[in-house]
């Protein structure tokens, strides 16, 4: 496996477990990826230590984005497997800032990955 994430030199945060970069194909201002240093494809292959280290980066990045961009909310997401939409098979967590009126109706949030399932 040769991860394109490891080639990115500009890192926002880093700890012994992982690092944070801006998403090259951001869906909103401030969209970040939290990435483990160890290359593995699936979140469910993470060790307990990795989950803790990545979660620490996730919270640190959330605070940074709140200060820098003042979003109104966040989506946190992981695509686990090809049929869940994963295209880079180096596990990563999306932290997507959301802004009032960035979509007509945000109801359902991540449920909208399946068209028509966001309303309930």
Model features per residue range: what roles?
Residues 1-120:
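HIT superfamily nucleotide-processing domains
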């Amino acid at each position: 496996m040769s991860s394109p994430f490891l080639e990115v030199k500009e890192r926002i945060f880093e700890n012994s477990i992982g690092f944070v970069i801006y998403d090259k194909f951001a869906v909103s201002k401030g969209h970040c990826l939290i990435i483990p240093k160890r290359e593995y494809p699936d979140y469910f292959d993470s060790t307990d230590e990795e989950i803790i280290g990545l979660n620490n980066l996730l919270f640190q990045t959330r605070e940074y984005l709140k200060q820098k961009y003042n979003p109104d909310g966040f989506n946190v997401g992981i695509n686990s497997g090809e049929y869940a939409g994963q295209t880079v098979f180096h596990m990563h967590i999306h932290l997507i800032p959301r802004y009032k009126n960035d979509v007509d109706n945000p109801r359902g949030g991540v449920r909208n990955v399946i068209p028509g399932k966001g309303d309930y």
